[in-house]
A protein has these predicted regions:
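Leucine-biased recognition of intrinsically disordered, low-complexity hydrophobic segments
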Residues: 17-19, 27
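Short, Lys/Arg-enriched N-terminal segments with co-localized hydrophobic residues
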Residues: 26-42
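A cross-family phosphate/adenosyl-ligand binding-site feature
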Residues: 39-144, 182-217, 222, 226-235
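Active-site/ligand-binding-proximal alpha/beta "capping" segment
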Residues: 136-171, 178, 230-232
Length: 235
């Protein structure tokens, strides 16, 4: 059953939760559980109960990518943090999920109806939701998570990372963002971000508003100590 501190408009089917717009939801929505949203919490001590992990649906060229993904899943589970991810059985996404589950942690998947119909939904998750579209999938993951970590991945991973980074920049959310720089994967990406700073398209403070570490445990520690700073977007 979902955390009562969360608010969600879906309906549970076994361990699955279908979002509005899904055909099953229209049938059983009248019988759905409802919860109230927690009104406030102490921001002085950042409590991270859940972390959305963005990463590749492939394993990548280096075994280090999978090793670091496995370490992250275990560390999040041992810290009592629920892993929020894309809900599939593919690539680094599955590596993180399986490692967290093996360590006794909770894993909450959010997949799309298209991927679910292709048989790509992970069958062993604590909970998995079916979103009608990719956009709603991302929105739901952002809603569920208290923090975000990006691992090596493709354009989908970069898109998810940039969306939450931009939302923090505009103060639409106050949730820390981290990069697990496995095997130096994000080195060229960070050089490009530095180029944005050098060419006066990005304030330097925003460049340093994300946490970057090559070690999963150190990255999680950084996220816990993160403090949001309001910086004007325009130079």
């Amino acid at each position: 059953m979902p955390d009562p501190a969360r608010s969600w408009p879906g309906a549970i089917v076994d361990s699955w939760l279908c979002l509005p717009g899904h055909p099953v939801h229209r049938l059983i929505a009248p019988f759905a559980y409802t919860f109230t949203t927690r009104k406030s919490f102490d921001m002085a001590l950042r409590s991270i109960r859940s972390v959305a992990v963005f990463c590749g649906s492939n394993h990548g060229a280096s075994e280090t990518f999978a090793d670091d993904a496995r370490a992250l899943g275990r560390i999040l589970a041992e810290a009592g943090m629920t892993v929020i991810y894309g809900g599939t059985t593919n690539g680094l996404m599955a590596v993180v999920a399986d490692a967290a589950l093996a360590a006794g942690g909770k894993v909450h998947g959010v997949t799309t109806e298209t991927l679910h119909l292709r048989g790509q939904s992970h069958p062993g998750l604590t909970m998995c939701e079916i979103a009608p579209s990719l956009q709603l999938r991302k929105a739901r993951m952002i809603e569920l998570a208290d923090a975000f970590i990006a691992l090596p991945g493709g354009i989908g991973t970069v898109e998810e990372l940039m969306q939450v980074w931009s939302m923090n920049q505009l103060s639409e959310i106050d949730k820390p963002v981290g990069l697990l720089n496995s095997a130096g994967f994000f080195g060229a990406f960070l050089q490009f971000i530095d180029h944005m700073v050098d060419t006066k398209f990005l304030p330097a403070a925003h460049r340093h508003s994300i946490c970057v570490e090559a070690d999963a445990a150190s990255l999680v520690d950084q996220l816990r100590s993160y403090t949001h700073t309001d910086v004007p977007k325009w130079l």
